Amino acid sequence: MKFLDQAKIYVRSGDGGNGVVAFRREKYIEFGGPDGGNGGRGGDIVFEAVENLNTLIDFRYTQHFRARKGGNGAGSDRTGAAAPPVVIKVPVGTQILDDDRETLLADLDAPGKRIVLLRGGDGGHGNAMFKTSTNRAPRRADPGWPGEERWVWLRLKLIADAGLVGLPNAGKSTFLSVASAARPKIADYPFTTLHPQLGVVRLSMTEEFVLADIPGLIEGAHDGAGLGDRFLGHVERCAALIHLIDGAAGDVVDAWRTIRGELEAYGGGLADKPELIVLNKMDAMTPHQIAGRRSALERASGCKVMVISAAAHQGVDAVLRETLRMIREQRQ
């Protein structure tokens, strides 16, 4: 399934039904009086977050949603039927933005959460509503009120407990595949992963968390370089970050600073999230190189650095345990 995390759609609620002009007509009743009923309400536009979706790809093919008009009134004071709502199902974590892509209208961040974005128009009054002591037989009925319409943007921010960040080819996809049942594409070239990947990490029957692999960032991503920073939005909801660094690539401190700079430039509190720095590919380094690069990273970051080999399954469990501890600390 293709991944799509942004979509623009048109929504319109239903018009209200028209009121009707009608008079009571029965045997032996010469002047029955007005009995025209009111129109029914138009259909609402409702958004609902559901668990079994993880992409907005459906909105690439269906971009217009219109609710039905309410039923017209009828004689004998019968009110028109209200039109059913149009329920638009979106993945959990979807934000609804105005056409300017800035104004947040709703944040559907929990399964089952619903929002009535547009209300259907009210039904018009039938002539029975206009009867007075001086106007016993009104011939006036109102049309239904029009519905509302607007263009909106849908933006998906995946719900994950921890985010996996790092430069391209740092080994993030390999780490995710080892840590969870996810099977992302893995290859020895930059930008193998083009879309965020989610995996559930199960440490025991009662201990698990969701890990998101964010496509590789490069210097200048916040200005659109590489894949840009659009996928950083998926990290905003994470409680902790695993910063994976390719230990065999050379200047590990420069690699760490590059990603830190992008997190700070993006904003949104990303730079303030708890960060676990992990030096990957220990199997491709000598013990002397491991000690030197680990020490340099710890001096630059002021944090403890863990060393692993995702490909050889070395040290991964310890990283996952520490990540779970950080998540629990943040969620309290």
Swiss-Prot record:
HAMAP family: GTPase_Obg. It comes from the Bacteria. InterPro entries: G_OBG (IPR031167), GTP-bd (IPR006073), GTP-bd_Obg/CgtA (IPR014100), GTP1-OBG_CS (IPR006074), GTP1_OBG_dom (IPR006169), GTP1_OBG_dom_sf (IPR036726), OBG_GTPase (IPR045086), P-loop_NTPase (IPR027417). Monomer. PANTHER family: DEVELOPMENTALLY REGULATED GTP-BINDING PROTEIN-RELATED, MITOCHONDRIAL RIBOSOME-ASSOCIATED GTPASE 2. It comes from Acidiphilium cryptum (strain JF-5). GO terms for biological process: ribosome biogenesis. Residues 160-328 form the OBG-type G domain. It is found in: Cytoplasm. GO terms for molecular function: GTP binding; GTPase activity; magnesium ion binding. GTP binds at residues 166-173, 191-195, 213-216, 280-283, 309-311. Its EC number is 3.6.5.-. SUPFAM superfamilies: Obg GTP-binding protein N-terminal domain (SSF82051), P-loop containing nucleoside triphosphate hydrolases (SSF52540). Its main location: cytoplasm. Keywords: Cytoplasm, GTP-binding, Hydrolase, Magnesium, Metal-binding, Nucleotide-binding. Residues 1-159 form the Obg domain. Its cofactor is Mg(2+). This is GTPase Obg. Belongs to the TRAFAC class OBG-HflX-like GTPase superfamily. OBG GTPase family. GO terms for cellular component: cytoplasm. Mg(2+) binds at residues 173, 193. An essential GTPase which binds GTP, GDP and possibly (p)ppGpp with moderate affinity, with high nucleotide exchange rates and a fairly low GTP hydrolysis rate. Plays a role in control of the cell cycle, stress response, ribosome biogenesis and in those bacteria that undergo differentiation, in morphogenesis control.
